[in-house]
Amino acid sequence: MSNPLNPNQTIAYLHAAARFIAEPQQPDGELRRLLREQYGIDARRLSRFTLLALLGALPLCQGLPENPAIYLASPFSSPSRMVSMRQKLAAGQPSPLDFMANLHNAATFQLAQILGSSGNSVFLAADAESCLSPLYAVLNALLAEPGQTVLLGWAYEQSGQDEQEGSVWWKISGSPMPQRQGWRIIMAAGGTAADLPHHTTFLPAALALDGRLHERGGLLLPPHGIWPALQIEPLAADE
């Protein structure tokens, strides 16, 4: 397949990143309190998965343009809500609200509602091996519509004991911000090999990508679909 890019062409701009990592066994009530106190959000009916996603995304939501797109990736939505739903079914007390709260796109819907956005709202199933796929999906969207801004997130609710829970979010668009802060995504130099951290579980894989971006100042990404190898590098002040 032909390369859709020119050498040194800036494909997209990564303006900012944010994350929320829950404390071990942090109760839902504490997460709801954080949303209420920090953002004035009544989160009483939201699933744990949605709480974790919102707490990571909302720090990036100030000053967003109208109708940003939302892309969220995870292996699944809310294991705890599914357990509760099955228990109520077994007890003959089914709850339609539990079902609606556990739909895979409930978190993206809630975030879009908070932002008042009618932009694209997409949930993507992903695991540790495919945690870069959502980024390429965003780049595909920006290739088609460069003027949009996208909130890209990776969120995870534990399905077993002693797993990390939380979410990581990037704010990406096709044009630079006036502050000239962040990174740009360009074609990697010829012969450059990607050097990505390897993890077998989802959230640690996403956290490692985000951590390497900040610790080393950039990332080298492998070819994927129509995309050649890409590089995320710090944005120069004059760009």
Predicted regions and their residues:
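Conserved "HGTGT" condensation-loop signature of ketosynthase/thiolase-family condensing enzymes
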Residues: M1-L132, N140-E239
